[in-house]
């Protein structure tokens, strides 16, 4: 069980870093389209 957590932790951290970047990129694209 501990091995599963050890492999999931890095994935969760990466997702936590990537998702906000993707959201900000989407917002920029939407604002560009509106303008």
UniProtKB/Swiss-Prot annotation:
Q: Does the keyword Ion transport apply?
A: no
Q: Name one GO molecular function term.
A: toxin activity
Entry comment on modification after translation: Processed by the macrocyclase-peptidase enzyme POPB to yield a toxic cyclic decapeptide. POPB first removes 10 residues from the N-terminus. Conformational trapping of the remaining peptide forces the enzyme to release this intermediate rather than proceed to macrocyclization. The enzyme rebinds the remaining peptide in a different conformation and catalyzes macrocyclization of the N-terminal 10 residues.
Keyword terms: Toxin
**Propeptide residues per the UniProt entry:** 1-10, 21-35
Q: Cross-link (Cyclopeptide (Ile-Pro)) at which positions?
A: 11-20
* InterPro entries noted in UniProt: Amanitin/phalloidin
Q: Does the keyword Cell division apply?
A: no
Question: What family does this chain come from, according to its entry?
Answer: Belongs to the MSDIN fungal toxin family.
The record's function comment reads:
Probable toxin that belongs to the MSDIN-like toxin family responsible for a large number of food poisoning cases and deaths.
Q: What is this protein called?
A: MSDIN-like toxin proprotein 1
- Which organism's genome codes for this protein? Amanita rimosa
Q: Taxonomic classification, please?
A: Eukaryota, Fungi, Dikarya, Basidiomycota, Agaricomycotina
């Amino acid at each position: 069980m501990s091995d599963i957590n050890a492999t999931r932790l890095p994935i969760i951290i990466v997702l936590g870093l990537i998702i906000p970047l993707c959201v900000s990129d989407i917002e920029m694209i939407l604002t560009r389209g509106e303008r």
